[in-house]
Amino acid sequence: MDKSIPKATAKRLSLYYRIFKRFNTDGIEKASSKQIADALGIDSATVRRDFSYFGELGRRGFGYDVKKLMNFFAEILNDHSTTNVMLVGCGNIGRALLHYRFHDRNKMQISMAFDLDSNDLVGKTTEDGIPVYGISTINDHLIDSDIETAILTVPSTEAQEVADILVKAGIKGILSFSPVHLTLPKDIIVQYVDLTSELQTLLYFMNQQQ
């Protein structure tokens, strides 16, 4: 992907993909920027600006070809082939994610999970067929795998140490649910999911409306 694309635009790519998949399922062949914008709750100028980073995706007055754009975003997001990811941390959030069927919506799947060697799940397989291993064996299990992405759901006090282990094992991208900033090499991509912060932000905006 072109590194000059703004982060805000990049974060909307999966949303565009989801919308075009829905349009396709509904039998819609052409969609205007307004239809797309209304479906996402943004303005049509933002849609047109986002799409402009990728060249000529549609013709003015004719709308956007739904199937073409669906395939276009699938290609950008690498959703034509299955992407295996790993999960580290089988606490409450981790266990919930182990039961979440990513592959029902996109071609992503958690193919293995890790926790402290003493965790009662280690050595077992989940109902969905995901094996759970001890964290001391990460290198052994990653060496022959195609996994480059990890979901991190460990306590904040352990996040940096575990992230360092993942990077040394060859992980290139981390989705972290731990509310601490990770200090990692610049070529490692990290996305943060801070549920507490998001809820506090929601409550703030709700209070502002009162």
Swiss-Prot record:
| InterPro entries according to UniProt | CoA-bd (IPR003781), NAD(P)-bd_dom_sf (IPR036291), Rex_DNA-bd_C_dom (IPR009718), Tscrpt_rep_Rex (IPR022876), WH-like_DNA-bd_sf (IPR036388), WH_DNA-bd_sf (IPR036390)
The record's subunit annotation is: Homodimer.
Name the SMART domains for this protein.
CoA_binding
User: What HAMAP family would the database entry show?
Assistant: Rex
In its UniProt entry, what is this protein called? Redox-sensing transcriptional repressor Rex
Q: Which organism is it from?
A: Streptococcus agalactiae serotype V (strain ATCC BAA-611 / 2603 V/R)
Q: Where in the cell is it found?
A: Cytoplasm
A GO MF label:
DNA-binding transcription factor activity
Q: Name one GO biological process term.
A: response to redox state
Coarse class of the primary localization is: cytoplasm
One protein family per Pfam: CoA_binding
The alphabetical list of record keywords is: Cytoplasm, DNA-binding, NAD, Repressor, Transcription, Transcription regulation
Which SUPFAM superfamilies does the record match to this protein? NAD(P)-binding Rossmann-fold domains (SSF51735), Winged helix' DNA-binding domain (SSF46785)
